[in-house]
Regions:
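Glycine- (often His-adjacent) and acidic-residue-rich active-site loop
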Residues: 1-19, 141-142
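CoA-thioester-processing core
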Residues: 17, 27, 33-83, 97, ...
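Well-ordered beta-strand positions
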Residues: 39, 45, 81, 85-87, ...
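C-terminal long alpha-helix characteristic of the crotonase
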Residues: 47-52, 100-144
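Short, structured loop/turn "capping" segments at alpha-beta junctions
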Residues: 50, 76-80, 89-96, 123-129
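A short beta-to-alpha transition loop/helix N-cap that caps and shapes the active-site region
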Residues: 56, 90-91, 139
Length: 144
């Protein structure tokens, strides 16, 4: 893709429906690539089944990829490897680099996520919102 073609590329925010003050959880079972990975990255917690695969396929299609969310989450080295290689990584590698917080069997994925969501739903909303905001402020201060 040349520079002229890039001018015609429109960025679509695939994560707009996820932006909320409340906690969000992604359950990943299967492939989370390109826009699917972007949606998972927009969630606060990512739990994967052992079947999950993650990748940045935009490089394969000569498309630009906004790297900031991935770099913030896993660090520069692992993010750059994913962005430039176009390779898939498995759930256990995703856990090792911090892309996901937990790996469970496919059969336990939905019950695990539902249990966590139920527990989070029991907490006072104001405390949950304040905790999330404080965590993001702390993260942003640490990266400045």
């Amino acid at each position: 893709m040349n520079d002229t073609a890039l001018k015609d590329v429109k960025v679509i925010d695939l994560t707009q429906h996820i932006k909320t003050d409340k906690g969000t959880i992604a359950a990943v079972n299967g492939y989370a690539v390109a826009g699917g990975l972007e949606r998972a990255l927009a969630c606060n917690i990512r739990i994967a089944s052992e079947n999950a695969q993650f990748g940045c396929f935009e490089i394969r299609r000569a498309l630009p990829n906004p790297p900031d969310p991935l770099i913030r989450l896993v660090g520069f080295g692992p993010a750059l490897h994913m962005l430039l290689s176009g390779e898939l990584i498995g759930a256990h590698e995703a856990l090792r680099i911090g892309l996901v917080t937990k790996v469970v069997s496919a059969q336990k994925l939905i019950p695990t996520v539902e249990d966590l969501a139920a527990r989070m739903g029991e907490y006072p909303t104001g405390v949950l919102v304040a905790t999330k905001k404080a965590a993001f402020v702390g993260r942003d201060m640490a990266t400045e």
